[in-house]
UniProtKB/Swiss-Prot annotation:
Residues 44-76 are annotated as: Disordered. Keywords: Ribonucleoprotein, Ribosomal protein, RNA-binding, rRNA-binding. InterPro entries: Ribosomal_uL4 (IPR002136), Ribosomal_uL4-like (IPR013005), Ribosomal_uL4_dom_sf (IPR023574). SUPFAM superfamilies: Ribosomal protein L4 (SSF52166). The gene is rplD. This is Large ribosomal subunit protein uL4. One of its GO terms (biological process) is translation. It comes from Clostridium perfringens (strain 13 / Type A).
Length: 204
């Protein structure tokens, strides 16, 4: 079983914690990670981009000049794509980019992402602030020399969220909002002991 240090928010190690091998010690499946990240980013897309083709632009129904005899290039419509204010060739239309991923693949990707972050994981005994204080959050992050950090709490914690939301490169989320992309995108994974237990309950 993987074992990592257990720390307080001052950066002092207060013990160790055994991690569940079925969640934090699996073989990393790069294919599943790729599929889930691609789907996650695709699902964020609005898909509302739209432009008009030559048939949809107003006007242009009449031939601008006769076919032959003018010395100019032949033209059929002032709304052809080569004209100013003409239609767009292969104009983009609203579409749905959503991708669905099987539940089993999502689980494999999540456990793979968690396993890949064990070396960069800081497990906190507890994480609470009496009031929203960015200074306190910065002090804690500096104690661990954390860069581009994802902080995962067991529940929604307003004081922790408000303390860290103005710090560049820091994301705070409750354990039920964790996702593969954010896990892979962080340099340091800071997670409370209670959040670890909840993850193991779901994915073990």
């Amino acid at each position: 079983m993987p074992k990592v240090g257990l720390f307080n928010k001052e950066g002092q190690q207060v013990g160790d914690i055994q991690l569940n091998e079925q969640v934090f010690g699996v073989e990393v499946n790069k294919y599943a990670l790729h599929q889930v990240v691609v789907a996650q980013l695709a699902n964020k897309r609005q898909g509302t981009q739209s432009a008009k083709t030559r048939s949809e632009v107003r006007g242009g129904g009449i031939k601008p000049w006769r076919q032959k005899g003018t010395g100019r290039a032949r033209q059929g419509s002032i709304r052809a794509p080569q004209w100013i204010k003409g239609g767009v060739v292969f104009a983009p239309k609203p579409r749905d980019y959503r991708m669905s991923i099987p539940k089993s693949m999502r689980k494999v990707a999540m456990t793979s992402a968690l396993t890949s972050k064990v070396a960069d994981m800081v497990v906190l005994e507890d994480l609470t602030f009496e009031a929203p204080k960015t200074k306190e959050a910065v002090k804690m992050l500096n104690a661990f020399e954390a860069k581009k950090t994802l902080i995962i709490t067991a529940e929604v914690n307003e004081n922790v969220y408000k303390s860290a939301r103005n710090i560049r490169g820091v994301t705070v989320m409750p354990v039920n909002n964790i996702n593969v992309y954010d896990l892979l995108n962080c340099k340091t994974l800071m997670i409370t002991k209670e959040a670890v237990n909840k993850i193991e309950e779901v994915y073990a």
